[in-house]
Amino acid sequence: MGFKKASLIAFIGLATLSLAACRKEAGQAHQSAKVGIIQYAEHSALDAAREGFIEALAEGGFKEGKTLTVTTRNAQGDQANLQTMVEQLAGKNDLNFAIATPAAQALLNGDQETPAVFTAVTDPVSAGLVDSLAKPGGNMTGSIDATDVAGQIDLLTKALPQAKTVGIFYNSSEVNSEVQAKAAKKALEKKDLKVLVKTVTTTNDVQQVMTSLANQVDAVYLPTDNTVASTASTIGDILKEAKVPSMGSDDAYLSAVLFTSGVDYKAIGKQAGKEAVAILKGKSPATIKVAKPEKAKIAVNDDMAKALGMDSQAIKALGK
């Protein structure tokens, strides 16, 4: 065998081994991991989701400071920050984790190579994140915070039978909020109730728009919404002064409303964390079903109930 021919065969052999090694690397189980987290906003629900995610990783053998390195970025509710933050994480981790729809969309647009998991997303199909809940089909899966909106409206009308006009308030630029708001409007109209919808696109408009809404309705429904969560104190003060009872889909803003009925964000964060563990151990995101919330929980703001002259125990009883 000639030297050139032998060299060529050796080169092909090495190239084949190299490609095989790359394929193995892409699907092999990690003994330790680097994980990037991009969180859309700073509020208790999203913080709880992040905590649940980290907990699940630890339970799966990836403990921060030992076998897990975490890099976290928080956009503070400003979508303009997301692209830069995604660029800081892209290609530098074994897996990325997005908390809330805007963060997940930015991550998918900016890094399609790194496996990713999301949570606190209401409708990942409409948001363009996955092909379907059963078969995500790409390099991303996660857990959703979709709630039974029709069930929430049933609860609202039982708790507030005197309400004839119900307001809905949310940030129209958030896909998840839009989905819930439309479902709530439909459910309320089926009950022959008048519906008044008011929206904002930034936190700067919350006080003015919410004040206007509170003066025109008998009750308010707040879907899962990052802007609502981050301005809960302002919203609560307005509703209390106007003596308008309200229901929220997220206990992150329980302080602003009479009661909430929604998902446990730490629990859905933990669901996403379990999926992340499976991916880090070699499973493809494309084949991991998007996880759904296991059970809604009801919480009542006793201080708000007292301020409105309502019986908090009677509302709590509706959830049993």
Report the location of each language-model feature.
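Extracytoplasmic "Venus flytrap"
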Residues: 32-60, 71-80, 173, 227-230
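Beta-alpha junction/loop-to-helix N-cap segments that form part of ligand/metal-binding clefts
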Residues: 75-131, 225-240, 244-248
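Hinge/cleft segment of the Venus flytrap/periplasmic-binding protein
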Residues: 278-320
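An alpha-beta-alpha
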Residues: 53, 141-188, 289-304
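Bacterial signal peptide processing site
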Residues: 23-25
